[in-house]
Amino acid sequence: MYLTVLESNHKFMIKWFEEYSNLSSNQYSIFLNIINSVQNDLSVFYKMNDILDNGNGEFTFNDEDMFVTFTEINGTYELSSSFGSVTLDYYAFKTIISKIIDIYSETYPLGTVVDLNSFYFKDLLPIEDNDSIRVVIMNRFTPFTDELFFYYTGVIYPVGNNGTNISMVNFSPIAIEKVVHEGYKDEQDTQFVGIEKKRLLIDMGMHSTSILTEEELSKVEESIVVREQ
């Protein structure tokens, strides 16, 4: 019997926490409980990452199901929640958040047409601030370095590789503003995504460019847009 996508994601997440995270069961249960509470809405973890990127500040989330507060304290970071608290350094939180985002982000099938938010392509493409970029997803889990991969690679719609010097655009799930048309998806595709996530995220210890440290960001920026030579 096949596991559902959510069941597979939970299985991968627990395996990573138990075997690779160096967290105690009490510590990683805090993250698992938050994941279970937010379901498919990963914005809480993106907001936590914003605090890491800015180096200071505080993020607070509060609803009827749980509260979460994420704060920088003297060079370390504290996550407080309805399920407990944990204090870790910058790199530990970056690693954990990147795994959560990569494992639980929805993976759209090949041929999906999406509008990308221009905010994530400033100075990389000749577009206005309010414009979106329409692309067709042509590849997923594209290796970049031994540690990093691009979640999606696409071509500009409707021209593709013709009539422009832009051959490919590499992007992450957070850049997707709208799904215009979803490509063909079946059981075989679902199994492929699960196999690739396990291979890259668990077995090989890689992560996508969705969540990056300062050092990693400098390596990635010039490769987001691939131009014809």
Residues of each region from the PLM?
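Intrinsically disordered, low-complexity, charged/polar segments
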Residues: 91, 150-229
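Basic/aromatic-rich interaction segments and small domains that mediate binding to polyanionic partners
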Residues: 60-76, 128-183
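Short, charged beta-turn/beta-strand-edge "cap" motif at the junction between a beta-strand
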Residues: 117-124, 128, 141
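Long, low-complexity, charged/polar intrinsically disordered regions
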Residues: 49-85, 90-101, 115
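Hydrophobic transmembrane signal anchors and adjacent membrane-proximal interface regions, especially
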Residues: 3-4, 14, 88, 132-133, ...
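Mixed-charge, Lys/Arg-rich low-complexity intrinsically disordered regions
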Residues: 20, 28-34, 81-121
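Short linear motifs at secondary-structure transitions and domain/linker junctions
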Residues: 54-55, 88-92, 104-109, 127-134, ...
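N-terminal intrinsically disordered, low-complexity, charge/repeat-rich segments that act as generic
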Residues: 1-73, 228-229
